[in-house]
């Protein structure tokens, strides 16, 4: 095979430094042509209807496409350029159209159905049967049974949605990069700690500017809204951040996602109805643990009923504190983080800046890897050899089993920078695949947006940042520790969307455990362990404003579900109207009328969480209950890093992927069904 084009190489890892925008189109064209030839061979009437020929061959074809597309998609998210974006969008359109055609290929559907109907099917392994069952379900959800003109229309919708969601995400990225405010007088930064100022100074230096540069990157927004004494600066940053890509704010109309949201919701609804569903919320549940919209809404509203009274009390306490101690008569949205930090400091004497000194990024990484070693008997360490990466800050680590044998790898890209999508995520670079010859080992991308090292200090993380890191590593372990050899149902692929957050949220619990913290909570300059006094304060403050936080998540989840479930073609999307309705049910603090949160809600309008944001809380029930098993084994020492329970968790949940239903895997581990009260206990809200 030609290796002139790096995207056509069979090398174990992508050659990131060699990938050019001009490589993308030719590589994808060639791979899709070969893919189609492979499908044509499978679907010829004389072809075998054997599992290996029909199913394994599809996995091989799909993996070749994935090996090329995964690095391209990743570069689009972390190293965006106009040329790359244009090439990505053109290729994405071709891939989406190809995938739509594949999902509606009746000859291929018949071939897969023939495998399921074959005499030897019941003797196949559980993962092999699951692969076939998932494929048949996905054919039905792709409109394979539709007749013309609905069949063509469904395919058109898929292509249009792909373009719109990409455009939505690009608009958010562009809007984030488009606003900045230069600060020349350091007095305007009063209240912002030195670590935060260092980040703002670094942003200015990158642009050859003197002074400090406030941007809409997460470290900057967090520093200003949490610490800046200047109320006007907080308001300006909040205004710019909360109106990104909308009809409001400093760049009103320039990157506006309003029309895109209207079209996205209309098309999702139309596609769902073509498939026979009442709405796109109902359609989304075809691949989730929850089975009906009523079940999801009852779940959310039950939590609202329990959390909202607590949140209302918390907000009144905050308002009173702001009035009496900060002379803020009317608490506004841009005051909340600032006043909350002051209240937390007053109540618990917990200084977040003091705490950050004990979470230097290198130490946190090392400790996180030690937790994984003690739980699962694996080692995670940087590789000695040079590996091709897309930015000098990127690290590459290998996972090895107890015998020292490599089993997986992960790229770590952890610092915020221009041209990089905000937030934190794990994505697949390579999936585990064994087709009887060589084994392709799983490789993950782990991406965060932490403040980079500055002023001679390493990157210092907030405790929330530490939890974010553990969360994404939990996703990574789910992907990397799979023992399933079939990529479509291995790792996170194919797992019900409202269960996929279980392994990630589970890992967050170790950030609150003394034994685990002792592995990595060390002062960046003195190497002193986290003092007991500081740990006790941290623990005491753990559930500070838990009701307000939970209500905010419930507001997001309810808005997302209602905007899909209640869509009415005669009335349009009613995005802001639906958000107001969700706030009336779930919120305790109402932002200004000009706030445009949905316009940058990429999880729902450009990610996989459409009618699925509730999944975070649903999975949190599962993860809290799972962690309960570790707490039960901890004994008086409180050591929850139990290798025996860890091995059971790995064997029953992490490693089985989607080879069986998530509920079945949960029961295999816990010995019973999930208990919803586990979530309330984890928030300190249980009666």
Residue ranges of predicted features:
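Charged/polar positions within long, soluble alpha-helices
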Residues: 40, 44, 67-77, 96-107, ...
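C-terminal, non-catalytic "cap/extension" segments appended to globular domains
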Residues: 1-23, 30, 190-191, 198, ...
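Active-site-proximal, well-structured secondary-structure segments within enzyme catalytic domains
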Residues: 127, 131-133, 155, 160-163, ...
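C-terminal non-catalytic alpha-helical accessory regions
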Residues: 32-123, 553-563, 567-584, 591, ...
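Short, hydrophobic/amphipathic alpha-helical patches that form generic packing surfaces
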Residues: 64-74, 137, 239, 336-344, ...
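Membrane-entry segments of alpha-helical transmembrane domains in multi-pass membrane proteins
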Residues: 16-28, 50-55, 253-257, 296-303, ...
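Short pre-active-site segment immediately N-terminal to the catalytic Zn-binding motif
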Residues: 451-470
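His/Asp/Glu-rich acidic catalytic environments and adjacent acidic regulatory segments
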Residues: 2-30, 35, 77, 84-291, ...
